[in-house]
């Protein structure tokens, strides 16, 4: 089966086939990958439990598909191009052969440090090639990687290490991000005070930040590599895995409490990311593909590492941020490396658009043939700017909708093949069966309708469980509507049948394309000694898409609001990370609560949005007077 669809008629045909014969369809896609042993059963599923098994009985190692199988034809082709934070530092390039050598080397390092198949390894590294090497080396030895984004706090790392019982941590002395140096090793040291399971920490040299190395626990990456080199760099045969063995855990925010560890498995995830990458981006061999995400998020896992490498692509990764040294940095990278495909977030597009067109002018972007967006719905203005200024009206925009839990793209245009409309994710990819339902789970049929977006049939890339807590997986995704996977997103299907994602329908915010649970932020704010209670909602933000608005009841009457605001932001940064800091903090004497004590977030959301004319029925509130006070305070904050 050809992984790439070449016309709209073919899309309709393949889509129909994939929905009517899902097992045959996915088996044909899977045949294009390398398996040590084939499956005896393509799919076994039940959304009630939930139980999802793809390619049962099959044996493989994903790294043989991402590296070994390309060596004969593509050994000297660049696999990874790395662009550093500082434009004056040299870039690095690793061919498929070089990447395989380095992955095998580091697989030996992991083994030498006691890592066995099935062990969990926490990775807290900057965006450097060693991050890709560490991820693939874990997969090669059969260990489960849990990558933590370099912007998370010590507390967030400790929670993730303890939840997964990680034996080993891979980190760096520090990381560069714009003008900042982030002291990653020191943050890990703070985290590990709370972690009993960690036996070893491997530390990469990047920033030369002074760090303390704990004897018997901490070792340098470079020293460990030297040991393997003195043994003559032996090969490292990949560990044979079952298709349903765990590949990685990635933590994501939910509407309640602590982040949950989404589990993806070896076989299905490989097939799904490889297929969706090849098809949606219509990747042609020799193209340079640049995804600006961080590997600490699912986009980096699926569309910097596993998807592109499984297809023999050249994947460009960038250590820095789009706005440093100035807002032309991404376009300098495109110009320098003759990038063909750019995949970035609407937040980045909006901030670059706001900086002004002078940063685009004079850059040679003629190599670009395809563009993509990810992380949140894109507004029409940003879509048009991206299309005109970056794609010069010639590069189709693939506006992709998917989630950490889905493993890969679900609803998305296929570049140059299916139509595009600004702000629309358009049509489901083959094998994906979306359905809109009302509050009671009744299907909303026809077009020009809106509802809650669910998926009614499994696909190979979907999550299998939440680590150590299968019941939470069932409750979060499979209990709202019977026999459906509930996405947590609202959706509009227009008269032509195209899908537009309208945003979360639960208590989860999408800030700069990052998912943050309101409960998480509230819990962090409430840790501040001067805070009695808080409620957090989202509001429209010109750059981030959604901003974080916190309503806070402070103890005592004489609060220095500005000082307390700074303190609260520091508290949130310390507990979660800087990405969760509220954009607005409003002090209030009370919160709108029902008689049963439930906070009416709907009302707070409207006030935060500035939509105070129609707050709906407030008669059920315990103290309706508090609403007027909050409205007045919100006006003041705006002014």
Regions found by a protein language model. Name each.
Residues 63, 80-136, 153-158, 213, ...:
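Conserved AMP-binding/adenylate-forming core of the ANL superfamily
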Residues 76-78, 202-203, 209, 214-251, ...:
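Conserved pre-ATP/AMP-binding loop-to-beta segment of ANL
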Residues 91-97, 239-240, 247-271:
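Conserved AMP-binding A3 loop
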Residues 148-174, 188, 335, 342, ...:
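AMP-binding/adenylate-forming catalytic core of the ANL superfamily
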Residues 427-431, 442-477, 516, 612:
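Conserved ATP/PPi-binding loop(s) of AMP-dependent carboxylate-activating enzymes
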């Amino acid at each position: 089966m050809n992984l790439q669809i070449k016309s709209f008629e073919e899309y309709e045909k393949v889509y129909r086939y994939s929905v009517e014969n899902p097992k045959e369809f996915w088996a044909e896609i899977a045949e294009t990958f390398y398996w040590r042993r084939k499956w005896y059963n393509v799919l076994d599923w039940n959304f009630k439990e939930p139980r999802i098994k793809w390619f049962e009985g099959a044996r493989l190692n994903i790294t043989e598909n991402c590296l070994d199988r390309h060596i004969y034809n593509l050994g000297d082709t660049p696999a990874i191009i790395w662009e550093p934070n500082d434009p004056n530092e040299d870039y690095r390039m690793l061919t498929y052969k070089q990447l395989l050598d380095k992955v095998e080397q580091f697989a030996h390092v992991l083994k030498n440090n006691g890592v066995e198949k099935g062990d969990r390894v926490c990775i807290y590294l900057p965006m450097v090639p060693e991050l890709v090497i560490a991820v693939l080396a874990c997969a090669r030895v059969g260990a489960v990687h849990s990558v933590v984004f370099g912007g998370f706090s010590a507390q967030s790392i400790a929670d993730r290490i303890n939840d997964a019982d990680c034996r080993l941590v891979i980190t760096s002395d520090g990381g560069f991000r714009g003008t900042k140096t982030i002291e990653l090793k020191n943050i890990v040291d703070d985290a590990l005070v709370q972690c009993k399971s960690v036996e070893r920490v491997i530390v990469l040299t990047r920033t030369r930040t002074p760090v303390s190395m704990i004897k018997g626990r901490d070792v340098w990456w470079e020293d460990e590599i030297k040991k393997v080199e003195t043994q003559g760099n032996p090969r490292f045969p990949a560990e044979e895995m079952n298709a349903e063995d765990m590949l990685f855990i990635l933590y994501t925010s939910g509407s309640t409490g602590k982040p949950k560890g989404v589990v993806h498995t070896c076989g299905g995830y490989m097939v799904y990311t490889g297929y969706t990458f090849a098809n949606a981006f219509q990747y042609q061999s020799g193209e340079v593909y640049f995804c600006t995400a961080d590997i600490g998020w699912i986009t980096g896992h699926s569309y910097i590492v596993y998807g592109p490498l499984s297809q023999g692509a050249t994947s460009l990764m960038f250590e820095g941020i789009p706005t440093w040294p100035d807002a032309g940095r991404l376009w300098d990278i495109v110009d320098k490396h003759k990038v063909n495909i750019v995949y970035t977030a609407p937040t980045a597009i909006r901030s670059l658009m706001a900086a002004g067109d002078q940063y685009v002018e004079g850059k040679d972007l003629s190599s670009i043939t395809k563009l993509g967006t990810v992380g949140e719905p894109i507004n029409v203005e940003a879509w048009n700017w991206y299309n005109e200024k970056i794609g010069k009206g010639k590069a189709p925009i693939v506006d992709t909708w998917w989630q950490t839990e889905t493993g890969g793209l679900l609803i998305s245009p296929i570049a140059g093949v299916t139509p595009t409309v600004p702000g629309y994710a358009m049509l489901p990819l083959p094998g994906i069966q979306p359905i809109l339902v009302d509050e009671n789970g009744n299907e909303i049929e026809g077009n020009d309708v809106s509802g809650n977006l669910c998926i009614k049939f499994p696909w190979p890339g979907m999550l299998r469980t939440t680590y150590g807590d299968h019941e939470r997986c069932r409750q979060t995704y499979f209990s709202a509507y019977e026999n459906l996977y509930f996405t947590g997103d609202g959706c509009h299907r227009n008269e032509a049948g195209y899908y537009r994602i309208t945003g979360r329908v639960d208590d989860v915010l999408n800030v700069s394309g990052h998912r943050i649970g309101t409960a998480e932020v509230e819990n962090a704010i409430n840790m501040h000694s001067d805070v009695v209670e808080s409620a957090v909602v989202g509001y429209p933000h010109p750059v981030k898409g959604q901003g974080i608005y916190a309503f806070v009841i402070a103890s005592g009457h004489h609060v220095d609001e500005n000082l307390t605001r700074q303190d609260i932001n520091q508290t949130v940064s310390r507990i979660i990370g800087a990405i969760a800091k509220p954009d607005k903090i409003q002090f209030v004497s009370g919160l709108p609560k029902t008689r049963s004590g439930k906070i009416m977030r709907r009302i707070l959301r409207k006030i935060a949005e500035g939509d105070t004319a129609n707050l709906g029925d407030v008669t059920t509130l315990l103290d309706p007077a508090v609403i007027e006070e909050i409205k007045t305070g919100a006006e003041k904050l705006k002014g």
